[in-house]
């Protein structure tokens, strides 16, 4: 599976990308939302794992861009965030086209099963 991981926390991206690579997935990492969008525009991914709370161009900004350009419903998006989301926030993300919302920290095998 070809996976794009967008998260500003380099410790998290290192652990997750190493785990997913060992499990046989091809994992591309972006520590910035805008750079993540550039990857999306130039490469076809099976899944995007996206953090919401990033400095500058946030995960919400990435979702807005994908929605405005008709890409949100075409991509499998898994939100992985430490942010405290209400049930309504989670429902709204799912209604927009996000496939799964997961809370950090999460066991890596559970994350992989969600892909």
PLM regions: where:
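Hydrophobic/aromatic residues positioned on beta-strands within the core alpha/beta folds
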Residues: 80-81
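Two-component/phosphorelay signaling modules centered on CheY-like receiver
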Residues: 10-28, 95-96
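Acidic, metal-coordinating helix/loop segments flanking the phosphotransfer/catalytic sites
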Residues: 29-47
């Amino acid at each position: 599976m070809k996976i794009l991981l967008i998260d500003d926390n380099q410790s998290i991206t290192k652990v997750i990308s190493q785990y997913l690579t060992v499990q046989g997935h091809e994992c591309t990492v972006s520590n910035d939302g805008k750079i993540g969008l550039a990857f999306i525009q130039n490469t076809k991914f099976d899944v995007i794992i996206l953090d919401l709370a990033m400095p500058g161009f946030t995960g919400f900004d990435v979702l807005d861009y994908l929605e405005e350009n008709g890409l949100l419903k075409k991509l499998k998006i898994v939100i992985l965030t430490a942010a405290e989301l209400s049930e309504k926030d989670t429902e709204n993300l799912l209604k927009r086209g996000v496939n799964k919302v997961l809370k950090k920290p999460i066991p890596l095998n559970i994350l992989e099963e969600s892909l």
